[in-house]
Amino acid sequence: MKKKGLKKTFFVIASLVMGFTLYGYTPVSADAASVKGYYHTQGNKIVDESGKEAAFNGLNWFGLETPNYTLHGLWSRSMDDMLDQVKKEGYNLIRLPYSNQLFDSSSRPDSIDYHKNPDLVGLNPIQIMDKLIEKAGQRGIQIILDRHRPGSGGQSELWYTSQYPESRWISDWKMLADRYKNNPTVIGADLHNEPHGQASWGTGNASTDWRLAAQRAGNAILSVNPNWLILVEGVDHNVQGNNSQYWWGGNLTGVANYPVVLDVPNRVVYSPHDYGPGVSSQPWFNDPAFPSNLPAIWDQTWGYISKQNIAPVLVGEFGGRNVDLSCPEGKWQNALVHYIGANNLYFTYWSLNPNSGDTGGLLLDDWTTWNRPKQDMLGRIMKPVVSVAQQAEAAAE
């Protein structure tokens, strides 16, 4: 099925020099002000160490996966200013895309205004990731790392390429798990963004079966850091016994018969991606019953996982430019927001950035003004966030 094409249209300088030497690093510990504690799953819930359900309001902030090797927007504003705004708007979870090429010794950060970001001067890309995690933790914002692509040039169908083989994919994940294992600001790993094409589920083919690969990588990560959540996206079709087409990363029908099973229990979170007609036309958008037909499609494709109490569902990407109920994209977005809220699912909205070509962002093109119509829509499913200071005060009472 024709997916969304180049959904994430970036305005970057394409400098694609490949290398394989990782930057040296020192494991980064949690700042005293960071959010404390890790999470695990309990049926379809994500809960903390005391069994209290997590209250996440999430978004994506991309850039580290691109040839800029840094977060987008730092050419306009400071990292501190942007994180302050994210927190002010009620978000406490960032899905942070990266590429394996980020860690190559030849990769250098580009397009940063160092007058606005003097503390980033001289830092290499992974140190910029460190800085984002440090600053997010100081604000009570937690991080899910997202292996978005192998090389910075574009998406890949499978979790590996000739230049970035499976061994590199896993070794980088283990490196990150070790680097942040003492820092509960980082709570999870989204193993690979949007498997599609050749990627299969339940076929048993070691070179294409994404479920088996997710188990290999998930177990490798948990052998280093058993506290992380492991987020597993779907495929687009090619599911054993069911070749129905869906969005890249969105088809999780295979979980019913072929679930991901890890050595450490209660760590798997399934994370579909879902988009609207502003990204690509799909048959269900042309159904006369649209948008009333959508909940049944979501139930069948990925929503059943939560409804049947198999595991939590975190919708890792969804977004679009228009939220007006007078247009198809607005009808789709509002219907999905209602579905997420009605079924108590988790989400990370795509995206903070305005420079995602066919979805836009929560920021407008000036990189400063918040998109109020989108925020008003998402506000219906955003949960009250208790700050670290408030938690400490409550514990002292």
Swiss-Prot record:
Q: Which GO molecular function entries does the Swiss-Prot or TrEMBL record give?
A: cellulase activity
Name the residues annotated as catalytic in the UniProt entry: 194, 317
What does it catalyze? Endohydrolysis of (1->4)-beta-D-glucosidic linkages in cellulose, lichenin and cereal beta-D-glucans
Superkingdom per UniProt: Bacteria
| InterPro entries listed in its UniProt record | Glyco_hydro_5, Glyco_hydro_5_CS, Glycoside_hydrolase_SF
UniProt xrefs under Pfam families: Cellulase
User: What Gene3D superfamilies does this protein map onto?
Assistant: Glycosidases (3.20.20.80)
Q: Which UniProt keywords apply?
A: Carbohydrate metabolism, Cellulose degradation, Glycosidase, Hydrolase, Polysaccharide degradation
Keyword Cytoplasm attached: no
Q: What PROSITE patterns does its record include?
A: GLYCOSYL_HYDROL_F5
SUPFAM superfamilies recorded: (Trans)glycosidases
Please list the GO biological process terms of this entry.
cellulose catabolic process
EC?
A: 3.2.1.4
Task: Please state which protein family the record places this protein in.
Answer: Belongs to the glycosyl hydrolase 5 (cellulase A) family.
Protein's name according to its UniProt entry? Endoglucanase
